[in-house]
């Protein structure tokens, strides 16, 4: 995988550098409640600022549908960016036109300016050539540090790279290098853990993974659908019975590709979906008709951890059970801790991503121990599905 990075950027003092960042952070009562995404892009902004560039930040926030919406203004985010960077961040009330141009013209070398929400213009999501040209007029160089938006062919993620010299920021670079280790050119054996509630949201993912990994562990509500497809009565467990044929096709594809499928052999069942509910461990073939499986059981955990022990590379998307409710977090926590320990010892490359996955690893207090944890959501999932990422592909073409 070849693309230009900040290492290739020299002599940029005084240059206007347009940096696409991900500032789509949660806000409550006007306050940013989670600054993770801002922290991720801070190193790129600081590096460009220290090199004397005029740093101009481009980002979207929410879904304003091509029109200005007051509570989706990036002005709300500017103070949080300032706090993390520990330097003044100026704000312009538009991302194109005179307001943007004048604010950029007023910048001194090394200063940072945040432009207004790119999605306040319909041309952003349409990747409209006229809008791209208007954005490009504000910069000499383009840096994309928003992998999380790389699956969208929008003006600020893909269009700009066709108009200006384009580079990957440090977060984009780290993400792409980690993903290359995960599935692009991994050390084998490769084990994938895929969990979560529904097979229907991850059909493309499963079909792609069985061709690329040595073993696929299926957990969460998804496992019930696969068990039911094999004739197992899963009681009142979450199950997509209408996807039985899809599940069978995925199992057949795995068999043909030589990919081992690891399904639960036992489970933790309960009759109520609440914290501290009465529960018991049963064989998956003995799930009571009035109960639901909410986590995989101890024998299944042992089997999963055995696969993690054999793996050189682990790719993880989705929890193994209803981890947000005690005691149905045991399997997810046990597998996460085992993977983290092997990663710390240098025996495993572990790459994880997806909102629930990040929350689960944080719950297990091991997120920092994984080789890489992606906060990219949709882009991470589409990468795992083997789909093209326009924002990445255009950077490779620039090389």
From Swiss-Prot:
Q: Please name the GO terms of the biological process aspect recorded for this protein, alphabetically.
A: gluconeogenesis; glycolytic process
PROSITE patterns the record matches: PGLYCERATE_KINASE
What pathway annotation does it carry? Carbohydrate degradation; glycolysis; pyruvate from D-glyceraldehyde 3-phosphate: step 2/5
Gene Ontology CC: one annotated term? cytosol
Q: What class of enzyme is it?
A: transferase
Reactions catalysed, as given in the entry: (2R)-3-phosphoglycerate + ATP = (2R)-3-phospho-glyceroyl phosphate + ADP
- Write the Enzyme Commission number(s) for this entry: 2.7.2.3
* Protein name (record): Phosphoglycerate kinase
- Species per Swiss-Prot/TrEMBL record: Sinorhizobium medicae (strain WSM419)
Lineage at the top is: Bacteria, Pseudomonadati, Pseudomonadota, Alphaproteobacteria, Hyphomicrobiales
């Amino acid at each position: 995988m070849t693309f230009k990075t900040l290492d290739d950027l020299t002599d940029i003092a005084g240059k206007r550098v347009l940096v696409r960042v991900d500032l789509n952070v949660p806000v409550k009562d006007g306050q940013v409640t989670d600054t993770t995404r801002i922290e991720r892009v801070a190193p790129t902004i600081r590096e460009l600022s220290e090199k004397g560039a005029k740093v101009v930040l481009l980002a979207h926030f929410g879904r304003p549908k091509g029109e200005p919406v007051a509570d989706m203004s990036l002005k709300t985010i500017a103070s949080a960016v300032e706090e993390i960077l520990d330097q003044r961040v100026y704000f312009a009330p538009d991302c194109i036109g005179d307001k943007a141009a004048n604010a950029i013209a007023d910048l001194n070398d090394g200063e940072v300016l945040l432009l207004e929400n790119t999605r306040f213009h319909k041309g952003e999501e349409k990747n409209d050539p006229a809008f791209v040209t208007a954005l490009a007029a504000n910069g000499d160089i383009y840096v994309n540090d928003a992998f999380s938006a790389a699956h969208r062919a929008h003006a600020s993620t893909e269009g700009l790279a066709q108009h200006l010299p384009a580079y990957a920021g440090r977060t984009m670079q780290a993400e792409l290098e980690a993903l290359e280790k995960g599935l692009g050119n991994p050390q084998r054996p490769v084990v994938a853990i895929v969990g979560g509630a529904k097979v229907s949201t991850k059909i493309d993912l499963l079909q792609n993974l069985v061709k690329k990994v040595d073993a696929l562990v299926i957990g969460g509500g998804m496992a019930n659908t696969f068990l039911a497809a094999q004739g197992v009565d899963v009681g009142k467990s979450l199950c997509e019975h209408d996807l039985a044929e899809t599940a069978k096709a995925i199992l057949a594809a795995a068999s043909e590709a030589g990919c081992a499928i690891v399904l639960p052999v036992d489970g933790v069942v309960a009759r109520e979906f609440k914290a501290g509910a009465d529960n018991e461990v049963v064989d998956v073939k003995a799930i009571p008709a009035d109960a639901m499986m909410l986590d995989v059981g101890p024998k299944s955990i042992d089997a999963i951890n055995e696969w993690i022990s054999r793996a050189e590379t682990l790719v993880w998307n989705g929890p193994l059970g209803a981890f947000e409710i005690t005691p149905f977090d045991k399997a997810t926590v046990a597998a996460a801790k085992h993977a983290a320990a092997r990663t710390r010892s240098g025996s495993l490359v572990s790459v994880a991503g997806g909102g629930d996955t990040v929350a689960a690893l944080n719950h297990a207090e091991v997120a920092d121990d994984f080789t890489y944890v992606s906060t990219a959501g949709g882009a991470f999932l589409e990468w795992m599905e083997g789909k093209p990422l326009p924002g990445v592909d255009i950077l490779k073409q620039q090389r």
